[in-house]
Amino acid sequence: MISQREEREEKKQRVMGDKKLISSSSSSSVYDTRINHHLHHPPSSSDEISQFLRHIFDRSSPLPSYYSPATTTTTASLIGVHGSGDPHADNSRSLVSHHPPSDSVLMSKRVGDFSEVLIGGGSGSAAACFGFSGGGNNNNVQGNSSGTRVSSSSVGASGNETDEYDCESEEGGEAVVDEAPSSKSGPSSRSSSKRCRAAEVHNLSEKRRRSRINEKMKALQSLIPNSNKTDKASMLDEAIEYLKQLQLQVQMLTMRNGINLHPLCLPGTTLHPLQLSQIRPPEATNDPLLNHTNQFASTSNAPEMINTVASSYALEPSIRSHFGPFPLLTSPVEMSREGGLTHPRLNIGHSNANITGEQALFDGQPDLKDRIT
């Protein structure tokens, strides 16, 4: 019975002590006076209860990383003193380390669970009430180290939050940096695509032009006989030589057959109706005199037509020298008197003149004879 009463009294004292700790605003000064009182007087039961509660607070709250093991094992962790120059801290350490535990403390440990239930969530608020930062100041003393631990944990949480924010900001910055080159690469990609399209169009036009040129060269090669060249320069040379040969052949044909072959097809010749009537071949009649006069008229107009043809074709002087007036053996009056005797002479002279002209032309240009043959 007596033990039960003592336990009840101790519980009441603990509850009262908790209420006093929570309601007191100047806990640091109270703890300082209690520490000084412990130096001269033996500890009372209320002081032991308060120490026990502090010890429970210390166990309930996690220790930060920057606390050393020496501070956790000594009584400085119970009192929560910051700073190295406090003389009361050394005295309290020596006092608590040499103070033997009493029976009330042992009994209070047995009912620690009940005290923890009573204190519960109020430890954080009590720690917030008692704990305050006093780094470097010898006069400022914390009532409970849990306050500093809670504050340090809050600081750690805030530090983690800032780290997360920094990480997010860095990620956002990287995203912005990644977007910036993409925005810069946009115009460059457009310009490169435009250049590629222009190059493709140019290549297609070049292919079409080359295909047309090849087709024309093939057509030209088909017109030239015995053409075996493949390059364009040699094919053009052969075409030029072939055209020169054709011009010479046309000139020789005009010289052999006279102007009566195709007078209207010659380039650069404009013939009047009178000349056309003179150039027309004579009609076959029974009168030899009319036939002779028609031939004489045609031969008298022949040198003028030959000169015009030679000038139109721009013949060489050596060729022009051979085109002269045909020699007339007799006059028209003598021809009319002699009758049919002069007709064969005229024909013979005309044929001789043609032969001598062709021989002189071949003597001046021997290559022309080979090409024609």
Curated annotation (Swiss-Prot):
Q: Where are the compositionally biased (Basic and acidic residues) regions?
A: 1-21, 197-210
Q: Report the superkingdom from the record.
A: Eukaryota
Induction trigger: Down-regulated by the A class gene AP2 in the first whorl and by ARF3/ETT in gynoecium.
The family database entries (SUPFAM superfamilies) matched by this protein are listed as:
HLH, helix-loop-helix DNA-binding domain (SSF47459)
Q: Which Pfam families does this one have?
A: HLH
**GO terms of biological process kind:** carpel development; circadian rhythm; fruit development; negative regulation of seed germination; response to cold; response to red light
By its UniProt entry, which Gene3D superfamilies does this protein fall under? Answer: Helix-loop-helix DNA-binding domain
Q: Which tissue types show expression of this protein?
A: Expressed in lateral root caps, young leaves, stipules, maturing pith cells of the stem, differentiating vascular cells, shoot apical meristems and flowers.
This one is known as: Transcription factor SPATULA
**Which organism is the protein's source?**
Arabidopsis thaliana
What would be an example GO MF term here?
Answer: protein dimerization activity
Subcellular compartments: Nucleus
Which InterPro entries would you find in this protein's record?
bHLH_ALC-like_plant, bHLH_dom, HLH_DNA-bd_sf, PIF1-like_bHLH
| Stretches for region Disordered | 1-46, 141-210
Which portions of the chain have biased composition (kind: Low complexity)?
A: 141-160, 182-191
State whether keyword Transmembrane applies. no
- The UniProt record lists the bHLH domain at 197-246
Stretches of Acidic residues bias are at 161-177
Stated role:
Transcription factor that plays a role in floral organogenesis. Promotes the growth of carpel margins and of pollen tract tissues derived from them.
Print the keywords alphabetically: Developmental protein, DNA-binding, Nucleus, Transcription, Transcription regulation
Assembly state and interactors? Homodimer. Interacts with HEC1, HEC2 and HEC3. Binds to RGL2 and RGA.
Annotated GO CC locations: nucleus
